[in-house]
């Protein structure tokens, strides 16, 4: 599973963050590209995740997920699928 964070490119968009992330997920699926997490230089060795550092990846994207963890414990997850 490829991991990416758009917040590295935009900063925190507060109330618009979830909507923006949803658009990025849909565009990622439409264009078959995984956006990078920019400025990711030193990965935590204890976090064994498949990050997408500094450069996008062109590959088929059929499912994407957006996690939104808000202030005061208001959290939401959206999963998008081409099917």
Identify the function of each model-found stretch.
Residues 75-79:
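Short beta-strand scaffold segments in enzyme catalytic cores
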Residues 1-9, 17-71, 81-83:
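Structural signature of cysteine-dependent C-C bond-forming condensing enzymes
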């Amino acid at each position: 599973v490829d991991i990416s964070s758009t917040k590295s490119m935009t900063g925190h968009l507060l109330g618009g963050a979830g909507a923006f992330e949803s658009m990025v997920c849909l565009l990622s699926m439409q264009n078959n590209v995984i956006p990078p997490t920019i400025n990711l230089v030193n990965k935590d060795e204890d976090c064994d995740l498949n990050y997408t550092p500094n450069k996008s990846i062109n590959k088929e994207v059929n499912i994407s997920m957006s996690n939104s963890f808000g202030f005061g414990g208001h959290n939401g997850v959206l999963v998008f699928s081409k099917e």
